[in-house]
Amino acid sequence: MRVLGIETSCDETGIAIYDDENGLLANQLYSQVKLHADYGGVVPELASRDHVRKTVPLIQAAIKEAGLTAKDIDAVAYTAGPGLVGALLVGATVGRALAFAWDVPAVPVHHMEGHLLAPMLEDNPPEFPFVALLVSGGHTQLISVTGIGQYELLGESIDDAAGEAFDKTAKLLGLDYPGGPMLSKMAAQGTAGRFTFPRPMTDRPGLDFSFSGLKTFAANTIRDNGTDDQTRADIARAFEDAVVDTLMIKCRRALDQTGFKRLVMAGGVSANRTLRARLAEMMQKRGGEVFYARPEFCTDNGAMIAYAGMVRLKAKGEAGLGVTVRPRWPLSELPAA
């Protein structure tokens, strides 16, 4: 079975073709980072217009990369939410139109389920059950996963997501959008211990997160200590250490609560090298395992949508003729496969 995956939930146009026997056959990605950089963040209208320009050409490129024709595609999967409504509608409309024209099933995919399943694309995929840490610019969640669609929300951010906090703090440090990866690079030059940031909500029970206060703490630290290069690097180091420690503490609690031995990390922030190293060290000490996707599959991409679509199609998750998207869509509302 060959599934064409279409991802247009935010500012990346991702197209991929996944074969359930031969794996990933094609992967095309276009990033709108340069388009939105001057605005310091994603402009929804511009994102939608760029998806309109790029989606069909990338589909053509993916089919060519795979050495296939349209007749070789068995289903079309598209991101139906959550995300920016205009951006979602582009991918959903194209996906439904192609499925109708090719007379194949159309499969709506939950964006965060795509992220959650992205590590399944690797050579050593995780087995159920596991705790999933979904950490990105829009979400920070801990989820108990016992099977496809069997998701229990254990905790989530009550304000800013971790990735959003990274980008906002990077902006305070004078870094360009998207600032999260640049902040991490700057943090590598910082001196540990010069500044100490709080570890929000770790002094109380529970698995929820709060990262908005770290941005305020960073702003005050910058104001009081200047903006020379070393000071900025030291602040970046302190901020990153605080976020990583907080995520690690909450992951440890979630593993203790569930009794699971496997941790899956997914979403854009899961590409952070410091976070990967710290969680790998923690899981080794616990006698468990940590799983994550390769860096290019941590951010938004079509491969995860094609794979998730294949899984859902096998569970009879085909859509009707209507084009429906859900900008807000709790992962817990998905049916079990």
UniProtKB/Swiss-Prot annotation:
Superkingdom per UniProt: Bacteria
Cellular localization per UniProt: Cytoplasm
GO annotation, cellular component aspect: cytoplasm
Cofactor notes: Binds 1 Fe(2+) ion per subunit.
Binding site for substrate: 134-138, 167, 180, 272
Principal EC category: transferase
Cysteine disulfide links: none
Cited CDD domains: ASKHA_NBD_TsaD-like
Binding site for Fe cation: 111, 115, 300
Cofactor: Fe(2+)
Keywords recorded for this protein, A-Z: Acyltransferase, Cytoplasm, Iron, Metal-binding, Transferase, tRNA processing
Catalytic reaction list: L-threonylcarbamoyladenylate + adenosine(37) in tRNA = N(6)-L-threonylcarbamoyladenosine(37) in tRNA + AMP + H(+)
GO biological process, one term: tRNA threonylcarbamoyladenosine modification
Protein family membership: Belongs to the KAE1 / TsaD family.
HAMAP family: TsaD
PANTHER family from the UniProt entry: TRNA N6-ADENOSINE THREONYLCARBAMOYLTRANSFERASE, TRNA N6-ADENOSINE THREONYLCARBAMOYLTRANSFERASE, MITOCHONDRIAL
Descriptive protein name: tRNA N6-adenosine threonylcarbamoyltransferase
